[in-house]
């Protein structure tokens, strides 16, 4: 239980209904079901998913019909490989959509410097890493990009530390945030922290003032351990159920609950768990998570 006050805005990711990468998971689930069930489970917002319209004039009335706000949406960035100018051009349609729908943060996931073609289908041990020099240069580009994103779109960059990406481990996240400017906000993902082998509380202590978005994800420790021991891929881990919603796994959310209550955190809390909807019926699963957050 998190004992989270009702003043906090709680959203849910559409990944519980339809996976963005593993297209067979939730392929036949219509967007209408996702949004109606999200609203029925008492969520105030949602993040973007692959079945969402990408034109504000189309998406806005759909969300309004369900009483949902757009909390944010993932941008697949490549600043580890390309220039700030190239990233500016690539992000424009996405940033314009978020801005038009009133979002205040943009989720940034680094997709550069990954194994080509099928980066989430290779053994986790084959993940590519940045050298110290490359990390420093990357941090500089990320800071410039974040500054521009805020100036031109009023969006705070929420950097998503993530398995199989260049900021997966605690050392990598710390190295990056020690070298980026304050314009670069942190998306704290409790599940990705646990799956990467570190305690999310370290990020609360070191970078709490820079946390602008939170993903509430839990981990099934036994499944995660098996995935690591067998050196399986990220996607195979998802299929086997390494992630789940808060309250169903091994993550202790007590410190996070205290953080959002006591620090003035004003961002969204987003329930996010990549699962097979046939094994984890979405409405039942996210409703249980919503009760866990409120209890």
What are these regions (language model features)?
Residues 9-14, 71, 105-111, 209-227, ...:
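Non-cysteine beta-strand/loop elements that form the S-adenosyl-L-methionine
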Residues 84-188:
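Active-site acidic/histidine proton-transfer and metal-coordination neighborhood
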Residues 15-17, 49-51, 75-79, 111-113, ...:
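Active-site beta-loop-alpha junctions enriched in small/polar residues
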Residues 1-105, 136, 143-144, 151, ...:
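N-terminal pre-domain/capping segments
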Residues 247-262:
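A short, acidic, amphipathic alpha-helical segment used as a generic capping/interface helix at domain edges
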Residues 25-29, 113-123, 224-236:
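Short, flexible, mixed-charge acidic loops at enzyme active sites
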């Amino acid at each position: 239980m998190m004992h989270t006050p009702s003043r906090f805005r709680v959203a849910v990711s559409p990944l519980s209904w339809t996976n963005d990468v593993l297209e067979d998971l939730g392929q036949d689930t219509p967007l209408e079901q996702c949004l109606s069930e999200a609203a029925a489970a008492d969520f105030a917002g949602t993040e973007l998913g692959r079945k969402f319209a990408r034109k504000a004039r189309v998406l806005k009335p759909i969300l309004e019909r369900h009483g949902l706000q757009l909390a944010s949406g993932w941008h697949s960035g490549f600043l580890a490989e390309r220039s700030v100018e190239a990233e500016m051009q690539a992000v424009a349609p996405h940033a314009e959509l978020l801005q038009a729908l009133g979002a205040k943060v943009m989720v940034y996931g680094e997709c550069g410097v990954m194994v080509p073609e099928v980066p989430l289908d290779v053994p986790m041990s084959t993940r590519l890493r940045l050298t110290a020099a490359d990390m420093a240069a990357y941090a500089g580009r990320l800071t410039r990009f974040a500054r521009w994103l805020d100036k031109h779109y009023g969006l705070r960059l929420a950097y998503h530390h993530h398995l199989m990406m260049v900021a997966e481990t605690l050392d990598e996240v710390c190295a990056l945030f020690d070298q980026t400017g304050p314009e670069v906000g942190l998306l704290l993902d409790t599940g990705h922290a646990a799956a990467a082998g570190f305690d999310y509380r370290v990020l609360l202590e070191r970078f709490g003032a820079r946390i602008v978005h939170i993903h509430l994800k839990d981990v099934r420790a036994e499944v995660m351990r098996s995935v690591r021991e067998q050196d399986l891929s990220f996607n195979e881990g998802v299929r086997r159920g390494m992630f789940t919603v808060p309250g169903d796994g091994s993550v202790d959310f007590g410190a996070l609950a205290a953080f959002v209550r006591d620090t003035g955190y004003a961002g969204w809390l987003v329930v996010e768990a990549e699962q097979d909807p046939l094994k984890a019926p979405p409405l039942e699963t996210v409703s249980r998570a919503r009760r866990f957050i409120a209890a």
